[in-house]
Amino acid sequence: MRVLVWNMNKQKRAWDYLRGHAKEFDVALLQETRDPRLMADPRWSSVVWRPKAGPPGSPRTLWGSAVIAPSLELEGYEPNEAFPWLGELAGSVAVARSSGSPTWFASLHTHASPVPQAVLDLHSWADAPLCAPNGTVWEQDLIPFELHRLFAGETFLWGGDLNSAEAMDDLGFVGGNRRLREIWREAGSRDLRGRFCTEEQQTFFRPNRRPYQLDHVFADPLTESRVLDWRVDTPAVAATPAFSDHAPIVVELERCN
């Protein structure tokens, strides 16, 4: 099984790239994608999309997160009251369930700024472990916290543009990115890069910006043990013009019998 994880930067051209490589992946976790129901090949089996709303008072949808599969049957997950943040932060996360393994797939695009207080007041977050030394609450705290509760006891794979890199902690950011990894590992997630690259690998290629790895993929230990390859697919950003300012991550898993 091959999984592609990609922030498409809202580019229509990115869909040309994705459709052209459809035979090379089984599941794609997409972020900053236009409505995939309008862009995907209509023959594809599964399209799960969670849009972000436009500005307050506007019915316009900007973009969203998606889980798609050309031939694998997936069922979109609709959060209930037990997972208020997965519902409240829709568009930052799309979740799908499979009858195979991994059982769960989730595509995340977490914000690069704290959750506003007006939003925090909507639901309890008291049980979520926080990463930032200054006590601010981030989507990176809330969404994986609820995902791990949802996934409990089942296999899973989640990832996307997390707007987080360990290297940020060394450059005057608010901090807490390394602590995030500790929290996620304690909750049962393993970074799928770990067996292939000891250091973070650049996935963000916007001109005049630091070369961070903002995109990451995690899974439960059993799924992690099936990983055959993890790599950054640089041709998507090497094209002129580039298909996106993020390069996809491709993860290859040994298929289950």
Spans of features found by a protein language model:
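Soluble or luminal CAZymes and related metallo-dependent hydrolases
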Residues: 10-17, 85-88, 130-144, 175-176, ...
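Metal-dependent phosphoester-hydrolase catalytic domains
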Residues: 79-84, 153-157, 164-257
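Residues lining hydrophobic/aromatic ligand-binding pockets adjacent to catalytic sites
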Residues: 99, 118-120, 134-135, 139-151, ...
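Short, solvent-exposed loop/turn segments at secondary-structure junctions
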Residues: 9-11, 34-36, 73-74, 110-113, ...
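Structured beta-strand-rich core segments of catalytic domains in phosphoester-bond hydrolases
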Residues: 27, 31-115
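Active-site-proximal beta-strand elements of phosphoester/diester hydrolases
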Residues: 1-10, 102-132
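Short glycine-/acidic-enriched loop or helix-start segments at secondary-structure transitions
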Residues: 15, 37-41, 45-47, 117, ...
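Active-site beta-strand/loop signature of hydrolases that rely on acidic residues for catalysis
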Residues: 2-8, 18-39, 105, 141-170, ...
